[in-house]
A protein has these predicted regions:
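Acidic/histidine-rich helix-loop elements
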Residues: 44-54
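Surface-exposed loop and membrane-interface regions of Gram-negative outer-membrane beta-barrel proteins
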Residues: 52, 86-91
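Catalytic domains of carbohydrate-active enzymes, especially glycoside hydrolases
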Residues: 60-82, 321-325, 391
Length: 507
């Protein structure tokens, strides 16, 4: 791989930051903070009962985590800054001029120096100071910094998940259902570029925004806020998220002229038909991919907005065409079959997942195709990352693998997982695809959203009492060797590839 290729790890604020001994660094103003402790959610067992304040304390221990990443030989680090920490109180009062297009979308948001001054007055200076130190430390250690604006979480003043659930999104603080969120996101983006632009090498607006919509608005038992079924509101949220990305892009570009700006999408080109000879199943796989990521990426790379959610009816919206790179996350595939649309309002939901493959497997067994399965019940299917890169590349932008990892507390599968996925990334590069980086999820164990601390994704395990980082030695050795050599070595190929899984004969 090229010398400029980025080798890194990824993390998010809410999942990693909290957990100091005296609870001095809590973020109590986010939607997820309130969601995971809600009595209704706990009673229904939609959330684990684990709380983020019991976490790994990256807020204080970030110098240690950065040094561990440096010892691995990594040259890049991906993270987000928590919106609710920087702006725990609303930014609505900071007024901005904006312009609508003929379709009612926000075409332009005017961010001025006065806007930034007003935002700076209400920002939490302690958190700005803290994040400045975090990013500065990364730069001092020689990392390329990939900064995401938001990773699932939102300030409570923007999205109250309990109100949203109880009113079926008819409340004011209903997140991306409200177009005003587009304006607030543009302000947030501008402020981060203004304050931290000199410390950031690569920008992303959203991490997996469709996950928020699919699980929060269409899958009430997923454990994601606000836990409702409201297809019409889901459509509105998707349009607003697309619009918000474009306006955040413009806001960043106003103050940061060179750093590339992208978005991190999930399940790009990872759907497979149950019967590859059945036209209906083939169509179902195409719809699945389009729903997860194609609708989003088509709008942001071509300015084609599929307003009817049917893969056909598009309108040209040139001011949405704002994207420099595409980030993909890849954990497993999906195998789907044709069905009637789950939601008639969203025609592209005419698919159904097939149990025994992808994300729908019994934990720690074998999938129906004989592949190993993680602690989380996700099939290890490394071939899929090649197809994901190929699908993302069709949009004509450079590709970064921004998340790839496995829940594997005993570290039985992770060494093979890393080696096999890197092998398919190398194959993608050999095929001519412009892949520029690989970020492993994650450096350490962390808080896996509604599932709490049960799923262990880290190259380092974490003692949740002492917060000690304990190396998962074999995975660390494999990843370190790959990074040091710029790709797979003959030893790794010989010892790990061609072997799908190994028995636990020593632990």
């Amino acid at each position: 791989m090229k010398k400029e290729f980025l080798w890194g790890v990824s993390q998010s604020g809410f999942q990693f930051e909290m957990g100091d001994r005296f609870n001095r660094n809590l973020d109590t103003r986010s939607d997820w903070w309130h969601w995971v402790r809600d009595p209704v959610n706990l009673k229904k067992e939609l959330v684990s009962g684990d709380l983020p304040e019991e976490g790994i304390n990256n807020y204080e221990l970030y110098p240690l985590d950065h040094s561990l990443a440096k010892e691995l030989g990594l040259n890049a680090y991906s993270l987000n800054l928590e919106w609710s920490r920087i702006f725990p109180c609303p930014t609505y009062g900071v007024e901005v001029d904006y312009e609508l297009d003929g379709n009612g979308l926000i075409k332009r948001v005017k961010i001025t120096k006065e806007t930034l001054r007003e935002l700076d007055e209400i920002a939490n200076k302690n958190e700005v100071y803290h994040y400045t130190h975090v990013l500065t430390n990364l730069k001092k250690l020689g990392f390329k910094v990939a900064l995401t604006l938001t990773h699932y979480t939102h300030p409570l003043w923007l999205h109250d998940p309990i109100e949203s659930r109880d009113t079926n999104l008819q409340n004011e603080r209903n997140g991306w259902v409200s177009q005003r969120s587009v304006l607030e996101f543009a302000k947030f983006a501008a402020y981060l570029a203004y304050k931290f632009g000199h410390l950031v090498d690569i920008w992303a607006t959203f991490n997996e925004p469709m996950v928020m919509v699919e699980l929060g608005y269409l899958a009430p038992y997923s454990g994601f806020p606000p836990g409702v079924v409201n297809p019409q509101r889901a459509k509105e949220a998707i349009i607003n998220i697309i619009n918000a990305h474009a306006r955040a892009y413009d806001a960043i570009r106003e103050f940061e002229k060179e750093a590339p700006i992208g978005i991190i999408a999930n399940n790009v080109g990872t759907s497979y038909p149950k019967d590859p000879n059945d036209p209906e199943d083939i169509k179902a796989a195409q719809m699945t991919d389009f729903f997860h990521s194609g609708l989003l990426l088509q709008a942001l790379t071509r300015g084609d907005l599929n307003i009817e959610f049917d893969m056909e009816t598009t309108i040209k919206v040139p001011h949405l065409k704002r994207l420099d790179w595409i980030g993909i996350t890849y954990y497993s595939r999906e195998v789907v079959t044709h069905s009637e649309p789950k939601f008639p309002e969203i025609p592209i939901t005419g698919f159904r997942g097939v149990p025994g493959y992808g994300y729908s497997c019994p934990p720690n067994e074998l999938s129906k195709d004989g592949y190993p399965v993680s602690d989380l019940g996700w099939e290890v299917y490394p071939e899929g990352i090649y197809n994901s890169i190929k699908a993302a590349s069709e949009y004509g932008k450079p590709v970064y693998v921004m998340e790839n990892g496995i829940a594997d507390s005993k570290d039985l599968l992770r060494p093979y997982f890393i080696a096999s996925h890197v092998a398919y990334i190398e194959r993608a590069l050999e095929s001519g695809f412009d892949v520029r980086g690989y970020f492993h999820w994650a450096l350490t164990d962390n808080y896996e959203w509604a599932m709490g601390f049960r799923m262990r994704f880290g190259l380092y395990s974490v003692d949740m009492i002492t917060k000690e980082r304990l190396p998962r030695k074999e995975s660390l050795e494999v990843y370190r060797e790959i990074v040091e050599n710029g790709g797979l070595t003959e030893r790794i190929k010989r010892e790990y590839l061609g072997v799908r899984g190994r028995e636990d004969d020593s632990r």
